[in-house]
From Swiss-Prot:
Gene3D superfamilies: lambda repressor-like DNA-binding domains. It comes from Methanocella arvoryzae (strain DSM 22066 / NBRC 105507 / MRE50). Residues 143-162 bind DNA. It comes from the Archaea. Keywords: DNA-binding, Transcription, Transcription regulation. This is Putative HTH-type transcriptional regulatory protein UNCMA_15260. Pfam families: HTH_3 (PF01381). GO terms for molecular function: DNA binding; DNA-binding transcription factor activity.
Length: 324
């Protein structure tokens, strides 16, 4: 199926799973296609037919944004370069969980988590070592006896009982011998959280910013915001202080800017943030949805960030309460 068809199916599935969704992003650049929230779970979702089409640069941006939004990234695909994605298996692409749409359905609608993850060499299962040891001892099976039945060394069985992962073939044989499940389910959300610290973004780094971005975002930094510049997202930065986050756009006033401001408003509704667009030159509307439009010259008149929040309130631009 085409990527667009797959994306539409993913969106329909997430609606069915009672997620609140942002608009579908058709703005370039885009490191994700849609944002989705259900309760405290916020997903940044990217859809690719071939998950190996995900570049390292885009993956890094998606991971950084997920940390900033307190969310989790996920890629939905159909295949790698070599083979289709297996149902019930989780693949990793630069630290981001990747699954097919059937696995997504099982996880969020049927509440059946995957049990298998892909790694170099094949498909693996995380063994519940304590359960394995308890079952073995309850059945009076020695390490040597279990090792012989499985065709591995005693040391390998000891490692399984200490939490070492096993191939899917070994895990299935262990469950057959012990007549009980020993595999731990794979939680795709927790899987990212375990490595999220590696994606911690650095604030106030404008080395790759354009001159217009440096001027506008530099003003936000001057009045007290931490600014996280983006290069692959459908907005220019995420700005924050101790109390709030703002999805931030920077542009001349034009039709493309209005389209981006509209998407940012829908994203803010889902992410539970403010949305601000700093515009160079004259503009007519004061807001697009919940995205405040402000002239760069007007922003320079502010003494501190409280002036900006006062303006947000006076123009009745709301911060979404998603997930609260």
């Amino acid at each position: 199926m085409t990527r667009e068809t797959l994306l539409d199916r993913v969106i329909a599935l997430l609606w069915k799973a009672e997620f609140t969704l942002s608009e579908k992003c058709d703005i370039r650049p885009r490191s994700f296609d849609v944002a989705a929230r259900r309760g405290k779970t916020l997903l940044l979702v990217k859809v690719l037919s071939n998950i190996e089409g995900m570049s390292e640069e885009t993956s890094q941006e998606m991971r950084r944004l997920s940390v900033l939004f307190n969310g989790s990234p996920i890629v939905i695909g159909e295949h790698t370069n070599d083979h289709p994605l297996e149902i019930g298996a989780v693949y990793l692409r630069y630290g981001i969980p990747c699954v097919n749409i059937e696995t997504l359905h099982d996880f969020f609608i049927e509440e059946v988590p995957p049990l298998v993850y892909a790694a170099p060499g094949g498909l693996y299962v995380e063994i519940d070592g304590e359960t394995l040891r308890s079952l073995r001892e309850a059945k009076n099976i020695s390490l040597g006896e279990l090792a012989m039945a499985l065709g591995v060394s005693r040391r390998t069985i000891s490692k399984y009982e200490s939490g070492m992962n096993a191939t899917i073939e070994a895990a299935l044989k262990l469950e057959e011998i012990l007549d009980a499940p020993i595999a731990c389910p794979v939680n795709m959300i927790v899987m990212f959280e375990r490595t999220a610290k590696d994606a911690d973004p650095s604030p106030n780094d404008l080395r790759n910013a354009s001159a217009l971005e440096k001027e506008a975002l530099g003003t936000l930094m001057h009045i007290g915001f931490e600014v996280f510049h983006t290069t692959k997202a459908p907005f220019n930065a995420l700005s924050q202080d101790d109390a709030a986050k703002m999805i931030t756009g920077v542009s001349d006033y034009n039709e493309a800017m209005l389209k981006k401001a509209k998407f940012m408003s829908s994203l803010a509704d889902v992410a539970g943030t403010y949305s601000l667009f700093i515009v160079k030159g004259p503009h007519r509307p004061k807001a697009v949805g919940n995205t405040l439009l402000i002239k760069s010259e007007e922003l320079k008149q502010f003494d501190d960030r409280s002036d900006l929040f006062d303006l947000l309130l006076s123009r009745e631009v709301k911060k979404a309460n998603a997930g609260k």
